[in-house]
Amino acid sequence: MAEEKKHYMTAEGKKKLEEELHYLITTRRKEVVERIKVARSFGDLSENSEYDSAKEDQAFVEGRIAQLEKMIRNAVMIENEKVDGNVVSLGKTVRLMELPDGEEEEYTIVGSAESDPFEGKISNDSPMAQSLLGKTVNDRVVVNTPGGEMEVEILEIR
């Protein structure tokens, strides 16, 4: 059997996944089963859009449950205490300055399971994170983005 992919995450990220899994199993799954029962009571399933919709929801919920269980089972916890605080690594927050315009941005590098660009959490697999990992304060880094190359300077790591 092929080795399953490891999912790097913080304790906070793992907790969020566990909470979502708990909700899906204890609440959402039951809601969908009830919708299926109600839709079945309408009779003929061949032209029953409520039934079809509920079955689609069930497939989505069960798929997400399986996905979350796998991610949690293969979680590798990021422990910042064991990492040099002066080096960009998983779990670290990095403040950057785009060059030459001077615009500042801040990102936390997390595992792909908990990445959320809208919250400033970028996946360790992203081009930005790949360019930053292992670098230190004052390093200048060229990042390949979909919009072209971008140069940044690392201002702070925490």
From Swiss-Prot:
The keyword Lipoprotein does not apply. InterPro entries: GreA/GreB_C_sf, TF_GreA/GreB_CS, Tscrpt_elong_fac_GreA, Tscrpt_elong_fac_GreA/B, Tscrpt_elong_fac_GreA/B_C, Tscrpt_elong_fac_GreA/B_fam, Tscrpt_elong_fac_GreA/B_N, Tscrpt_elong_fac_GreA/B_N_sf. Keywords: Coiled coil, DNA-binding, Transcription, Transcription regulation. Belongs to the GreA/GreB family. This is Transcription elongation factor GreA. The gene is greA. Pfam families: GreA_GreB, GreA_GreB_N. GO terms for biological process: DNA-templated transcription elongation; regulation of DNA-templated transcription elongation. Residues 48-75 form a coiled coil. It comes from the Bacteria. GO terms for molecular function: DNA binding; RNA polymerase binding. Necessary for efficient RNA polymerase transcription elongation past template-encoded arresting sites. The arresting sites in DNA have the property of trapping a certain fraction of elongating RNA polymerases that pass through, resulting in locked ternary complexes. Cleavage of the nascent transcript by cleavage factors such as GreA or GreB allows the resumption of elongation from the new 3'terminus. GreA releases sequences of 2 to 3 nucleotides. The lineage of its organism: Bacteria, Bacillati, Bacillota, Bacilli, Bacillales.
